[in-house]
């Protein structure tokens, strides 16, 4: 005697249920979206480093969430067309996620800085101040970089790095590390403003996959490869 398989019930939302859901979750969703919008709008290294870190965490979580959703779409595809698109999107998301990790690891090997895993950019500016290497992300490799000292406070491209420095501590070269090569910027202009303030302009002078000698005597390491990053 053959058994008849009962088809699983298909649940669909009605318009009233959708409206009820929006009414119940509208306030919470609005707060969450407002929070994310503020973080993405004002999360810059030159404004607030803590807000910028939260922004990077949000961006970093976007890839795994996207992969989870695309896999979910593959498992519960509505039809073969949706299944095909879901498989393609899943493969693309996974490949881009792997490429991101490969590039981040390569940049980490070059700089030794955890900023290498920044999902926003693969450009890390590096400045060696009296043997201490500061590394910060920048959006692009500019033709010039500006380093400013205001009453002992060190700023590079508007990003505060440290305190207790003077113009005489500024190095002759700064670098921008990328995944495949290193950009060297040579100090082209220096101007003193008052007794404890001033600025220097560094101009891009060399690009290539090479090593720049360290300013630390006897360290045997490269300026863009030092491990005492901050």
Swiss-Prot record:
Keywords: Glycoprotein, Host Golgi apparatus, Host membrane, Host-virus interaction, Membrane, Transmembrane, Transmembrane helix, Viral envelope protein, Viral immunoevasion, Viral matrix protein, Virion
Intravirion face residues: 46-55, 106-228
Sequence ranges on the Virion surface membrane side: 1-24, 77-84
Pfam name, any one: CoV_M
Entry GO MF terms: structural constituent of virion
UniProt xrefs under InterPro entries: M_CoV, M_HCoV-like
Compartments it resides in: Virion membrane; Host Golgi apparatus membrane
Main location: virion
Membrane-spanning intervals of the chain: 25-45, 56-76, 85-105
Quaternary state and interactors: Homomultimer. Interacts with envelope E protein in the budding compartment of the host cell, which is located between endoplasmic reticulum and the Golgi complex. Forms a complex with HE and S proteins. Interacts with nucleocapsid N protein. This interaction probably participates in RNA packaging into the virus.
Functional summary from the UniProt entry: Component of the viral envelope that plays a central role in virus morphogenesis and assembly via its interactions with other viral proteins.
Protein family membership: Belongs to the betacoronaviruses M protein family.
Name of the protein in question: Membrane protein
């Amino acid at each position: 005697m053959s058994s008849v398989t009962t088809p699983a019930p298909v649940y669909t939302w009605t318009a009233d249920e959708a409206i009820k859901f929006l009414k119940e979750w509208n306030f919470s969703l609005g707060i969450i979206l407002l929070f994310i919008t503020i973080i993405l709008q004002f999360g810059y290294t030159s404004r607030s480093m803590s807000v910028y870190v939260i922004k990077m965490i949000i961006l970093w979580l976007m890839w795994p969430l996207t992969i989870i959703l695309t896999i979910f779409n593959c498992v519960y595809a509505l039809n073969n067309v949706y299944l095909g698109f879901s498989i393609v999107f899943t493969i693309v998301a996974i490949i881009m996620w792997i490429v991101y990790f490969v590039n981040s690891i390569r940049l980490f090997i070059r700089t030794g800085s955890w900023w290498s895993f920044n999902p926003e950019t693969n450009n890390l500016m590096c400045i060696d101040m009296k043997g201490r290497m500061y590394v910060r992300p920048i959006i692009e490799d500019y033709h010039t970089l500006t380093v400013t000292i205001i009453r002992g406070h060190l700023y590079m491209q508007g990003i505060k790095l440290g305190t207790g420095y003077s113009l005489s501590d500024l190095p002759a070269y700064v670098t921008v590390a990328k995944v495949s090569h290193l950009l060297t910027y040579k100090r082209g202009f220096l101007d003193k403003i008052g007794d404890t303030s001033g600025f220097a302009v560094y101009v891009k002078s060399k690009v290539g996959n090479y090593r720049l000698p360290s300013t630390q005597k006897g360290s045997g390491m490269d300026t863009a490869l030092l491990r005492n990053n901050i």
